[in-house]
Swiss-Prot record:
Membrane topology: Peripheral membrane protein
Family: Belongs to the ABC transporter superfamily. Taurine importer (TC 3.A.1.17.1) family.
Pfam families, alphabetized: ABC_tran
Record keywords: ATP-binding, Cell inner membrane, Cell membrane, Membrane, Nucleotide-binding, Translocase, Transport
PANTHER family with a match to the protein in the record: TAURINE IMPORT ATP-BINDING PROTEIN TAUB (PTHR42788:SF18), TAURINE IMPORT ATP-BINDING PROTEIN-RELATED (PTHR42788)
Domain ABC transporter: from-to ranges: 4-233
Name recorded for this polypeptide: Taurine import ATP-binding protein TauB
Reactions mediated catalytically: taurine(out) + ATP + H2O = taurine(in) + ADP + phosphate + H(+)
Natural source organism: Pseudomonas putida (strain ATCC 47054 / DSM 6125 / CFBP 8728 / NCIMB 11950 / KT2440)
Superkingdom field: Bacteria
């Protein structure tokens, strides 16, 4: 049974001649890690913003647990590419910030924040200031903050796009560990093909102008990592390489088609 449902979603900016998104149908079920991948102009971020409730669709319906999404809500935790952390708060204060706004007593919210810091391998970092953290550590704090409110769904907007290659791989592996431990459904958007293939239990390929779904792939590479197989072994598996090359060819053909129409 799906927790999150998108039915015939369309989106168009005022004054634009072409919709950003057209006829998008998606569902996110329990323990699923759904990744949306596509070139620039395919509407990835617009799609996440619709699910988060930051903007309303031009057409169609979005429901979470059968309830229409009509704005932002604590049941949807969001992790952004830019860490969006509060520089005047320490790490613990950042993770606990949403709980503070919700009126959770201090002792309870700090205990929850420390629990989430342990989950993302930042034990002992609670008193550090944001400027003392590396890029990867900031993203761990952002992930811990999103999880602290115990959302029904975790939304991730190209969360590792600004990180160096080594840190990006570390964060991908951490996300799979957190996903396995918490059983939270995740909707993640990315432009990184290898990342998408490695993480996704379902991979949705988007084409641009207007953004639309052109292919869906059911994958298990992330589940294999979560079950204990090494990332290196998975990424050298011929099945992984074949899938990555197939997705690369599809994305390349979309970009080429877009250039020919320009």
């Amino acid at each position: 049974m799906a927790l999150l449902e998108l039915e015939r979603i369309s989106a168009q900016y005022p004054g634009a001649s072409t919709p950003v998104l057209a006829d998008i149908n998606l569902s996110l079920g329990p323990r699923q890690l759904l990744v949306a991948l596509g070139p620039s102009g395919s509407g990835k971020t617009s799609l996440l913003n619709l699910i988060a409730g930051f903007v309303a669709p031009s057409g169609g319906h979005i429901t979470l647990d059968g309830v229409p999404v009509q704005g932002p809500g604590a049941e949807r935790g969001v992790v952004f590419q830019d860490d969006a952390l509060l520089p005047w708060q320490n790490v613990l204060g950042n993770v606990a910030f949403g709980l503070e706004l919700a009126g959770v007593p201090r002792a309870q919210r700090e205990a929850k924040a420390r629990e989430m810091l342990t989950l993302v391998d930042l034990d002992g970092f609670g008193e550090r200031r944001i400027w003392q953290l590396s890029g990867g550590q900031k993203q761990r704090v952002g992930l811990a903050r999103a999880l602290a409110a115990d959302p029904r769904v975790l939304l991730m907007d190209e969360p590792f796009g600004a990180l160096d290659a080594f840190t990006r791989e570390q964060m991908q592996e951490l996300l799979l560990q957190v996903w396995q431990r918490t059983a939270k459904p995740v909707f993640l958007i990315t432009h990184d093909i290898e990342e998408a293939v490695f993480l996704a239990s379902e991979l949705v390929l988007l084409a641009p102008n207007p953004g639309r779904v052109v292919e869906r792939l059911q994958l298990n590479f992330g589940q294999r990592y979560a079950a204990g197989e090494s990332a290196r072994a998975i990424k050298s598996d011929p099945a992984f390489i074949e899938t990555r090359e197939h997705v690369l060819a599809r994305v390349f053909s979309q970009r080429q088609s877009l250039q020919e129409r320009a």
